[in-house]
Amino acid sequence: MKALYPGSFDPLTLGHLDLIERGASLVDELVVAVLQNPGKSPAFSLEQRLRQITASTEHLGNVSVISFDGLTVACAKEQGTRLILRGLRAMSDFEYELQIAHTNRSLAPEFETVFLTTSAHYSFLSSSVVKEVARFGGAVDHMVPRVVAEDLARFFNSAFAPPSR
């Protein structure tokens, strides 16, 4: 069985990685699909996010990383799967994700969404929280893979570096 795990992953967190690892243990193949959303202004380019996820999942032989734009169900169809994997941290996530799952089923009734709850020690994590902590110089190495922590340090150091003379 093959599943699709879509998201913007800006940036990838250890919570995302935990879901990828756990999801990969449940299916024959897991496709991590990185959304290119023109309505958002990500901290990291699509290429950077693809590189971060690929580097962070290289130990998983059944995980591939792709990019997509448009509808998740269209991407899943292109990948030859009807199974979409999503993570839940709290009830507020469930309400949002349930709405998206119902929308996906209205577009393609053959699709199923499987929800995995996050591991308790990652339940506080979100990409937004990570960026906020990094923006103010806080340590994020316990929140993100090493490659992401390094990229965040470069991003925020360059964003706040004084102009050269």
Swiss-Prot record:
Substrate binds at residues 8, 40, 72, 86. Keywords: ATP-binding, Coenzyme A biosynthesis, Cytoplasm, Magnesium, Nucleotide-binding, Nucleotidyltransferase, Transferase. It catalyses: (R)-4'-phosphopantetheine + ATP + H(+) = 3'-dephospho-CoA + diphosphate. GO terms for molecular function: ATP binding; pantetheine-phosphate adenylyltransferase activity. InterPro entries: Cyt_trans-like (IPR004821), PPAT (IPR001980), Rossmann-like_a/b/a_fold (IPR014729). Signal peptide: none annotated. Pathway: Cofactor biosynthesis; coenzyme A biosynthesis; CoA from (R)-pantothenate: step 4/5. CDD domains: PPAT. It holds the Pfam family CTP_transf_like. ATP binds at residues 8-9, 16, 87-89, 97, 122-128. It is an enzyme of class 2 (transferase). The record marks 16 as: Transition state stabilizer. Belongs to the bacterial CoaD family. Reversibly transfers an adenylyl group from ATP to 4'-phosphopantetheine, yielding dephospho-CoA (dPCoA) and pyrophosphate. Homohexamer. This is Phosphopantetheine adenylyltransferase. It comes from Synechococcus sp. (strain WH7803). The gene is coaD.
